[in-house]
Amino acid sequence: MLSPKRTRFRKQHRGRMKGISHRGNHISFGKYALQALEPAWITSRQIEAGRRAMTRNARRGGKIWVRIFPDKPVTLRPAETRMGSGKGSPEYWVAVVKPGRILYEMGGVTENIARRAISLAASKMPIRTQFIIS
């Protein structure tokens, strides 16, 4: 699972996702890509599941680039805890994804192999996505 080695602060505010992505919305490494169409938090487990699905499907051919990184900690309180007594401890990491963001890129394979591999990764994502070609 992906997570930062160290951060400046242990906990973050939730924030809000408005507008479209202005960074990371063009293909820059491979030839084929998976692009987000909705805003969401994507967990490090979901990113890893998508990456594994793509590598298994493509087998030894091609190269895969993961274009998002989970750098936001999500805190959780223990179950059946009374209100108050501070914010919970960080449990997992998420990547904040806005519409237009490239999630994965792929190169060195034919289009139908890339399409199949990327559709498997798309099924692991909690949002609607689209397959794009540079």
From Swiss-Prot:
InterPro entries the UniProt entry points to: Ribosomal_uL16, Ribosomal_uL16_bact-type, Ribosomal_uL16_CS, Ribosomal_uL16_dom, Ribosomal_uL16_sf
One GO cellular component, as annotated: chloroplast
Keyword line: Chloroplast, Plastid, Ribonucleoprotein, Ribosomal protein
GO molecular function, a single term: structural constituent of ribosome
Cell location: Plastid, Chloroplast
Main subcellular location of this protein, as a coarse class: plastid
Source species, domain of life: Eukaryota
Biological process terms in GO annotation: translation
Subunit structure: Part of the 50S ribosomal subunit.
NCBIfam families, per database record: rplP_bact
Name of the protein in question: Large ribosomal subunit protein uL16c
